[in-house]
Amino acid sequence: MKQTPAHDQYNPDLLRMIPDGLKRIVEVGCSRGALARAYLQKNPDCDYVGLEIDADSAQVASNICRSVICTDVECMAEEALAAFSPSDCWVFGDSLEHLRDPWELLRRIRNHLSPGGMIVACIPNSQHWSFQVRLNCGLFRYEDQGLLDRTHLRFFTRITMIELFESAGYRITEGYPRIFNEPDREKFLPAIRAMAQVAGADPAMAEKDAIPLQYIVKAVPVQTATP
């Protein structure tokens, strides 16, 4: 897992997606504990566990979370993950895209969720209009933050984000886009519609999918039928 710059602010939309009253939460990439602080202010009895790869950020978060482990979550042994079982919610606030194999980690987590447990995630939209413009101009240059964060290892659109969870054994039960005021996009949307039309895709859907900067989703394990 690659590290993005530390931050002291939390995503309010992500916080709203996490139900109140959960007994145990595990946040992957808790940074300095901003989201944990906000949740614990309303839910002080929650066993909020932070996993953070950056030692300095983990040290700060340890003063907020109930416990913090400085680790690369993908390198954790199964018995280490089992120590968090059962967990009501695993939170990925812009961290799934930093993983080498998010599919495998999501599959492993399924074994350690409590009945009714869930994944809550915020995922950058790689179909965003600005991403398409840069790609069209040949300017796919990594940056220190944002959609082209140099620590991003995986890129997801709305469609492939859904496929990510489904292939790992989940179904998305709730989700919505994060849309910001970006007036510059209007001059590019007609071209995005036209490109989709030529490609045989739905122009209206292509335009709609080009507007969100991120998606907030809640996913639960698919229950397998027993014989």
Q: Model-flagged regions — what are they?
A:
Residues 4, 9, 34, 73-74, ...:
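S-adenosyl-L-methionine-dependent methyltransferase catalytic module, highlighting the catalytic core
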Residues 12-131, 157-162, 211-221:
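Conserved SAM-binding loop
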